[in-house]
Design a protein with these regions (language model features):
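N-terminal alpha/beta PP-like core and its mobile active-site loop of ThDP/TPP-dependent enzymes
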Residues: 1-259
Length: 259
């Protein structure tokens, strides 16, 4: 898993170790300087650190926690990433199969169904069925995190398959998924002409800038368009700073959070 994450451009994993997730730590050690682990004091901190890493790097943030009571503490940080469309891969584990019956008897603190708990704040959740499915699982997680409207995903790696040795075929990671936007949509010529016509006919046009303008790397183009048309621009909270706030055409942040 550590090698696959490094293939997708991840250079740091934020988390709190546990016995169930030790294979990830051994893998990070084996990868040398390609990827490192940063110890956090709390699982909640790990999710916010992964969120910040994704925002700053333009890639995917990764956090990890142990089974059950560790992984479910991801919820507040993943909720922020979900609401603001930040690509994060959260990694948890699961107890051995003979422990799972305790989930229904209320005697196992680490047998909480993490996938169900985190489902409302993640785009996608999956469980590793066999170690040979690891390349497919991590690639799907990365693709889900950065495609469409980006957001967090959750991977659960049960005790036994997480400790098995990979014996599957050679694989090649899709490095296009290493940063945003992974797949940039291209409008047709007709759509471009239509947009130009709408702008020409507008009497007092105003731009509204959202977080997608940040993640698409379009700051320079947006500034050039605003200046060429003398068009003021307002921003949502996540679009704050796309057009510098000291720019003469900046209207600041709109809504109750604006000024």
């Amino acid at each position: 898993m550590a090698g696959l994450l490094a293939d997708y451009g991840v250079t740091a994993v934020f988390g709190v170790p546990g016995g169930q997730t030790l294979p990830l730590y051994y893998g990070i050690l084996d990868e040398g300087n390609r990827i490192r682990h940063i110890l956090m004091k709390d699982e909640i901190d790990a999710t916010f650190a992964a969120d910040a890493y994704a925002r700053i790097s333009g890639g995917i943030g990764v956090c990890d926690a142990t089974a059950g009571c560790g992984a479910i503490k991801f919820i507040s940080g993943l909720a922020e990433a979900y609401n603001t469309s930040i690509p994060v891969i959260a990694i948890g584990s699961e107890m051995e199969g003979d422990w799972l019956a305790a989930r229904y008897r209320g005697t196992g603190s680490q047998v909480v169904d993490s996938k169900e708990v985190l489902k409302p704040v993640t785009k996608w959740q999956a469980c590793l069925p066999h170690v040979n499915k690891m390349p497919e699982l991590v690639q799907t997680a990365a693709q889900m995190a950065v495609s469409g409207r980006p957001g967090p995903v959750f991977i659960e790696c049960p005790w036994r398959p997480f400790r098995e040795e990979y014996t599957g075929p050679d694989y090649e990671s899709n490095r296009k998924l290493a940063s945003l936007p992974a797949h940039r949509p291209t409008p047709s010529r007709d759509e471009i002409d239509e947009a130009i016509q709408v702008l020409k006919e507008a009497k007092r046009p105003v731009m509204l800038l959202g977080g997608g303008a940040w993640r698409s790397g379009a700051r320079a183009e947006i500034t050039a368009l605003a200046e060429r048309m003398a068009m003021p621009a307002a921003a949502s909270l996540t679009g704050k700073g796309v057009l510098p706030e000291n720019h003469p055409l900046s209207l600041g942040v709109v809504g109750s959070l604006g000024g």
